[in-house]
Amino acid sequence: MSIQTSDISKLFGKQRALDKVSISVNKGELIGFLGPNGAGKSTLMKIITGYLPADEGEFFINGDKIISGNLDYKKDIGYLPEHNPLYPDLYIKEYLEISAGFYGLKNVKKRVTEMIELTGLGIEQHKKIRALSKGYRQRVGLAQALIHDPSILILDEPTTGLDPNQLEEIRKLIREISREKTVILSSHIMQEVEAVCNRVIIINRGKIVADGGIAEVKSGNLGQKQIVIAEFKESVSKEQLLAIEGIEDVAILGNTWELEAGPETEIRPAVYAFAVANKLTLLTLMQKQQNLESVFHQLTQQQN
């Protein structure tokens, strides 16, 4: 199933939590929402899942406009909130059977058994939820979100508080689930989104500041500064490099220079021409591949 939002806005008093947010999520995508705390990630997820109404804008599932109050589409969405709402005095099977009952599923016991197997809860299935570790509680939350076989899975900070082993196990599980479903997960951990997702949407102060494939966002083609690495055999001064058209700032790291340019500026031909004109030996000239963390900081700090 596909999801589209058009100019979605949400206000809490005078605070504009979302400001004309438009996204398009295609069937089968695994997308990461990235943003600082309070950026609007959870608010957008709650609007998509029907837990919050938008104040402005439109929302579509498979091209059909969702009318406020019509929540029939929720049967196609599985949702794991940031604070996983479990009942600690219930056994795992009890909790999942009750969850399945809300959707009027047939063969409830069979479906619960399938979810326990899928989420790796087999060894813990006879325990009460209060006796489970954080990692296994997250698995129970995932099993609940998947119990009715939704087409879309929404995961809000699904790995918060997990240890490194639990973290990798949940990431692996999410990747497996995404083979058959559209998955949106939110995080403020860049490494997590980079490890799991194939597309990232960066949200800051209620606005979309980047949207693209992981490689595309890291390449510097979405509005952030570009960095070129240059190394000369001969000595070159900072002033000489700043005089090259398009270069906005420079920094020296050992024997190499980092040359900063605007997002739409290709400075490598100008640097090469500078080397030729000054009879310099150019040992290195390449675009610096940024990591997602540096792009994130650059985009969110620009907005702030």
Predicted segments with their positions:
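C-terminal coupling/interaction segments
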Residues: 263-304
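ABC transporter nucleotide-binding domains
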Residues: 2-5, 10-204, 208-210
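Short beta->alpha junction loops/turns
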Residues: 66, 105, 233-234, 264, ...
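Positions that flank functional sites
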Residues: 115, 131, 256-257, 290
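ABC transporter nucleotide-binding domain
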Residues: 171-262
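Short coil/loop linkers at secondary-structure junctions
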Residues: 106, 122, 247-248, 281
